[in-house]
Amino acid sequence: MLKDIYNSLLSKKQEESNMAAWNNEDILETQAQLFFSIKSIKGLKIMDNPIKVYCLASLEKQSVQTSSIVINKDQSQIEWNEGYTFDVISSKSILALSIWQGNANVTIANNSIEGGGSSNNSKLVGKLYIPFATFKKQFCDQWFPLTGTSQSVSIHVKTSFTNSSKKVTVDDFIFLRMIGRGAFGQVNLVKKIDTGRLYAMKVIKKDKCLNMNAVGHTFTERKLLKKYYHPFIVGLKYSFQTQDSLCMVLDYIGGGELFYHISERETFSEETARFYIGQIMLAIGFLHEHGVIYRDLKLENLLMDLDGNICLVDLGLCKEGIQEGHVTYTMCGSPEYVAPEIINGTGYSKSVDWWALGTLFYEMIAGLPPFYSEDPHEMTKLILSSPLKFPPQISKNAASLVSLLLNRDPSKRLGSGESDVEEIKAHPFFKNVNWSKLLNKEVDPPFKPHLVGPLDLSYFDPLCTMNSQPINPYTINSNLSDQDQMAFQGFSYSAPDIFLNNNNNTTTSNTNIGGSGSNSGSAQNSPYNSLRNTPPSIISMMKMSGSSGGFERMSPGHFSPISVNKQQQIQQQQQQHHQPPPLLQPQPQFWVQPQHPNHIPQPMAQLPILSKLQETTFERRRSLSVNAQTQFTLVLDPNEE
């Protein structure tokens, strides 16, 4: 009987392992939660020294590292009795449990990536995958054998699955710490009260979003994250809005920024870079397969989960619907990574992502982007015409891959053909990569982050995590007009026609913009409303149980020649309609149409724009040699620091 269950689980896991197939049809209609408990473990072979054993559990990128238990040689079966709760969004969810063991007498001395990038101090014992079809039963209580181990190790697992019709709102979260800051708001580390899971809540100020003409980018990110799921792309759990802010609750990816990890070593070995680049290729290839150009690939947009796998974040600059043979002209991205055709304004397609991949790969193995300069004017010239040079330690296969990706002719660039990412996979540099195992996270990462607890933010920028407080959406007051609010219609998940104002009262919207995702009664009478008035310093000190995972940073207002000056457009409109400027009244954002953002006119194709790029001043993100501030200071008002 046990063997049949084991074979059934393996078959089901193989059937559903391609998690990239998630779409709207797979999203559950109601909120669901899975409670699981690891009761005990048996079958471990212990030599002389006692070992410590812990479990990494994950579901939909929610991650938990259990406490460690010490096991001695004479113990054949060990009681564990530790349980957690996950939020379940999709019918294709898989509960993944991996058991790790290490010497109980060894303490991890540091978190840096040593040598070729491997500093894992624990050994994988085995894994267990429990698919949705199994745990959706109300209760499950049985022993499961672990896979991927030569030992006959089994764990006793109990699960309980529940559904709820309750809508998620701001009141369901405790605000703990600010972990990222951008042009339109900030990203907060939050704790979901009922499950204890950690998430990254992106709080976007509506007025700034309107002022910077970024409503379309915000809706694009929400739409793509809601529509698709991929193992190496951050997931959207919930979205809702208040009178003055938009909120997206995203996976918290606790291993921190890849930028941080490469800064610790200056470079990665080619073997380590191959692992990360391979996972990035799978994510970008998935987007291309669905007609999406990413357009902002860089180290800062790559996070590491607790297992050491990569997660792509910030889809705000993605471009949808570009058909084969067609191009787009909007200039956007980050200056070190933009392709020549973007700078020249000749039009570009999906191959700009492969140029950025080549730049990123070069940066991983050489330490800086290939055409980097402290002078942005000089850097654009280097991107357009400078010969590509390699340090002596770069292998021939690596140099060949970079050269093919950094071909200035986009039609001849590796990956520009109809087969897209498959062209790059076939390069000799990836000869020994098992792409199926890499996609299913069955390849051991070169480095596994070690955290001392769920609030360990060691791998994030301390300028954000230590010196700033989280922002509660209810504290934002922008006094937007009804016309302004129309731009945000449809942002919330299945929200009723209400939203909460700053006084915690319920306001009915005649524009049907969608609300915070709560009805008026539950919002007004919520026992957690008092948390809005709790000082952030006190909230951040609240004791919490069990979750660790990672985070997603907000995108800055990237440079773009199509960005409009709000005041100029207002004056033009007033002149056309012969209206005097209103006195002491909020200026209207007239370019926001009173309809769904999908109907906002698309920007026209731009003529060559090298001169416009050179007129823009950029601040280099944190580099290996200069302690510069991150890109998030690029568009921030100095008074808001």
UniProtKB/Swiss-Prot annotation:
The active site is at D296. Residues 509-588 are annotated as: Disordered. Its EC number is 2.7.11.1. Residues 523-536 have a biased composition (Polar residues). It catalyses: L-seryl-[protein] + ATP = O-phospho-L-seryl-[protein] + ADP + H(+); L-threonyl-[protein] + ATP = O-phospho-L-threonyl-[protein] + ADP + H(+). Residues 173-430 form the Protein kinase domain. One of its GO terms (molecular function) is protein serine kinase activity. GO terms for biological process: intracellular signal transduction. Residues 431-503 form the AGC-kinase C-terminal domain. SMART domains: S_TK_X, S_TKc. This is Probable serine/threonine-protein kinase DDB_G0288795. It comes from Dictyostelium discoideum. Keywords: ATP-binding, Kinase, Nucleotide-binding, Phosphoprotein, Serine/threonine-protein kinase, Transferase. Residues 537-546, 567-578 have a biased composition (Low complexity). Residues 13-144 form the C2 domain. CDD domains: C2, STKc_AGC. Gene3D superfamilies: C2 domain, Phosphorylase Kinase, domain 1, Transferase(Phosphotransferase) domain 1. Induction: Down-regulated by phagocytic stimuli. ATP binds at I179, G180, R181, G182, A183, F184, G185, Q186, V187, K202. Belongs to the protein kinase superfamily. AGC Ser/Thr protein kinase family. InterPro entries: AGC-kinase_C, C2_dom, C2_domain_sf, Kinase-like_dom_sf, Pkinase_C, Prot_kinase_dom, Protein_kinase_ATP_BS, Ser/Thr_kinase_AS. It is an enzyme of class 2 (transferase).
